[in-house]
């Protein structure tokens, strides 16, 4: 079907609401916009769907949400008895999130699949926990995480509480594609409730149990009881779903001196105080830093709209504020967990940590120093969730901690996605431990570098929007795959990992990577440095990860800057 036909079909055949019709009519004389909205369908993958809000096949809207839900229902109904376990639905503070969540519940009800719909916005980790706690067959979160406000998304979770894997995503996609837009009916809400196909859930059903479980993750609860009231923290939920659970967990473990950025406390679908609601963006911390200076806090927490990611800012020795990178936060938490458990005599002999392949190699050194095995996965926290399940199924290892450089952290097994509530609790505990020793979180980070070496990690993104951008990304990856660099910045490429082929090639020898296939290229360099290239799974970007290390901070930073310049040329 050509784009013009698809546009006309949407406009005249099934777009039933006035807003969608008005949106379509507004682009009637804009062929480029029509092309972008209708040249392809919004893709569904392991990260679900994510896109710009608006009318069209390639946009996030209630018609794509309903169609995706009908496809998911068909997929689940391949086993009708299991489908009766139901699907849990959560949503964040974005535009249309509540409406999309309601539509999702009522499409499921129409198909005979029970829906558990939260009574208000909830973070990703509570959804993940709820799927497991309620023994549901699946879960859905309406969110676009940290994307700009014009985006929304639809993430699907399997019965273990982790995002669906590639095989399930492919199966769901096949059912979605075979579903006409006109074949996505909604059951009346009152009828769905009367038939037991729609249940509204809240604190009593899920949240209270989740918070109780998170409290068990404290490694030194007595330390929190002694030092918690002395610690001054500034927290911003950046207008998202973390406001209630993060403040609650901190309060219940004894951290009472938490100042919340009032301008960012309440839900705001436009995220009007920031350019992007992203806790790795310095702009998200401007108001928090102002408040921290006013109240004398030395630590700032920020969670993104769906509260699966945590950003941290710390006061340095000279009084400046420094934002910790996701890699630094991950290494602080890993080192604290392992060192504290070692001192307590509770570090298991079969302990394991897990990180993504694009996360810092510093974590490998830390884990090795405590005799803990580090496992690596592809990007996407679902793969960390898979490893947790493997450990439990086989009894081979005890999971201790998992993280991604993109500010996602987890130390529990009762949640299977990154957890900003869990991470907030642990960083607060580390801050208390530091205070008890007369040092700061910043000092703790520097002590890790002094012990293991200085590691610098940078991510460079090249945005390539639209149909042409997608083609260009494929060309770049094809060229690099066929003609990999032999050296970068004067350093020899010692090995090439091609995750699409599933191979690692070094000195003419080829061995399997042991990971699922994915369009990722990883160039190992001398002295433990490396560069990784991959297309983003959620945005029209190609990402370049540059990791360097040296015994001296300045040397590590200069090497990283030089290597970035050399590596960026690969994307031209």
Regions found by a protein language model. Name each.
Residues 293, 297-299, 320-322, 340-534, ...:
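Phosphate-binding and adjacent anionic-ligand microenvironments
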Residues 33-42, 152-286, 291-292:
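Gly/Ser/Thr-enriched, mixed-charge loops and adjacent short helices
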Residues 7-104, 192-230, 241:
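An N-terminal, well-structured beta->alpha segment
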Residues 38-58, 144-147, 233, 237-249, ...:
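Conserved phosphate/anionic-ligand binding catalytic regions in large, soluble enzymes, centered on
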Residues 157-187, 327-350, 355-364:
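Glycine-rich phosphate-binding loop plus the immediately following alpha-helix
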Residues 88-151, 254-312:
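N-terminal small/polar loop signature for handling phosphorylated ligands or for N-terminal nucleophile
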Residues 100-108, 151-158, 246, 308-327, ...:
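Short Gly/Thr/Asp-enriched flexible loops that form oxyanion-binding sites at enzyme active sites
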């Amino acid at each position: 079907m050509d784009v013009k036909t698809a546009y006309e079909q949407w406009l005249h055949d099934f777009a039933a609401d006035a807003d969608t019709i008005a949106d379509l009519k507004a682009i009637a004389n804009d062929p480029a916009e029509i092309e972008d909205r209708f040249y392809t369908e919004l893709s569904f993958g392991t990260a679900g769907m994510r896109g710009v809000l608006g009318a069209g096949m390639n946009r996030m809207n209630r018609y794509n949400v309903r169609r995706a839900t009908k496809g998911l229902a068909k997929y689940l109904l391949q086993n009708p008895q299991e489908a009766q376990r139901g699907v849990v639905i959560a949503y964040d503070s974005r535009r249309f999130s509540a409406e999309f969540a309601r539509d999702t519940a009522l499409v499921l009800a129409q198909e005979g699949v029970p829906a558990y719909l939260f009574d208000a916005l909830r973070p990703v980790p509570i959804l993940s926990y709820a799927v497991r706690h309620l023994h549901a067959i699946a879960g859905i979160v309406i969110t676009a995480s940290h994307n700009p406000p014009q985006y929304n998304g639809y993430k699907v979770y399997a019965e273990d509480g982790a995002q669906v894997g590639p095989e399930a995503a492919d199966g769901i996609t096949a059912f979605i594609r075979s579903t006409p837009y006109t074949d996505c009916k909604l059951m009346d809400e009152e009828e769905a409730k009367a038939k037991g196909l729609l249940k509204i859930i809240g604190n009593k059903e899920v949240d209270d149990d989740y918070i109780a479980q998170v409290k068990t993750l404290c490694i030194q609860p007595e330390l929190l009881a002694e030092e918690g009231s002395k610690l001054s923290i500034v927290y911003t939920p950046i207008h998202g779903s973390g406001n209630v659970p993060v403040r609650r967990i901190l309060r219940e473990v004894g951290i009472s001196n938490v100042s919340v950025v009032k301008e960012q406390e309440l839900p705001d679908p436009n995220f009007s105080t920031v350019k992007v609601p992203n806790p790795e963006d310095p702009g998200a911390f401007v108001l928090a830093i102002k408040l921290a200076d006013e109240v004398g806090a030395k630590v700032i927490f920020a969670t993104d709209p769906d509260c699966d990611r945590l950003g941290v800012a710390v006061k340095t020795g000279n009084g400046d504020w420094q934002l910790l990178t996701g890699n630094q936060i991950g290494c602080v938490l890993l080192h604290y967990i392992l060192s504290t458990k070692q001192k307590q005599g509770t570090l298991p002999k079969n302990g394991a940590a897990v990180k993504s392949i694009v996360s810092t190699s510093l974590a490998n050194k830390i884990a090795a120093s405590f005799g803990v095995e580090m496992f690596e996965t592809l990007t996407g926290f679902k793969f960390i969730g898979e490893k947790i399940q493997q450990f439990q199924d086989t009894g081979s290892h005890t999971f201790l901690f998992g993280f991604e450089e993109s500010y996602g952290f987890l130390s529990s097994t009762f949640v299977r996605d990154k957890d900003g509530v869990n991470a907030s609790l642990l960083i607060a505990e580390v801050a208390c431990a530091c205070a008890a020793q007369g040092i700061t979180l910043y000092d703790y980070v520097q002590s890790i570098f002094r012990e293991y070496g200085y590691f610098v990690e940078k991510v460079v993104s090249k945005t390539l929007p639209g149909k042409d951008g997608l083609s260009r990304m494929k060309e770049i990856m094809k060229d690099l795959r066929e003609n990999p660099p032999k050296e970068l910045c004067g350093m020899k490429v010692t090995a090439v990992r091609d995750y699409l082929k599933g191979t690692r090639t070094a000195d003419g020898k080829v061995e399997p990577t042991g990971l699922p296939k994915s369009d990722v290229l990883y160039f190992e360099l001398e002295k433990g440095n490396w560069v990784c290239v991959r297309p983003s799974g959620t945005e029209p970007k190609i990402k370049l990860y540059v990791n360097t290390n040296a015994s001296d901070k300045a040397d590590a930073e200069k090497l990283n800057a030089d290597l970035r310049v050399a590596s960026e040329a690969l994307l031209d």
